[in-house]
Amino acid sequence: MVSAIAGLTQAIEAVGRSENSQTLDQIRGYEGSGAARYFAAFSQLIVHPDFTFSLRVFHPPTDPVNSLLSFGYTLLLNNVFSFLLAEGLNPYLGNLHGAERQKAYLAFDLMEEFRSPIVDTLVMKLINQKILQPTDFSWATEEGGIYLVEPARRVFLKHFEERISSATSHPDVQGQISYRRVIQLQVKRYVKAVLGNVGYQGFRRTI
């Protein structure tokens, strides 16, 4: 755990030192390196003996933990996507992410800062508190992945809604607001950054 956190810290410091001197490919390289170290630390926080996690696998998810992460990230992406549309932004015009294939790259960019406080925290809770069990998953033979079955899927949706509606703080407003409201405020910050030529400040959860 200590070595994984140390490696993640080094990756973050490297990005901070780069400022504007790095290309997008180099920055994406830091992102990939940081993600690998992050999930190495994440795996060591799983204490449920029947769940294991060694590597982030995207499509299709090959184990229950990856399945939960992918499901949660999809729900989070949809929330960010909706707020982008509400502000009149094109969700497909990203800054960090982008490729020839048409995907909602701006939504992917802006959801990054919410993966850990919303989805990863939720997945850890559902596993470690034994709210979900390995028997809540099944193989989807056509897709070749592992997915939640009913009613476990509804359980996840219920807890996701509770998590994204839970209270936190944001420097742009006084008092406690929901994470969903924070997403909206961050999208508004992005609009100001684009229109006003000011730096974008990402959301950092206060613990």
List each language-model region with its residue ranges.
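Active-site helix-to-loop segments that bind/position phosphate- or nucleotide-bearing substrates
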Residues: 1-207
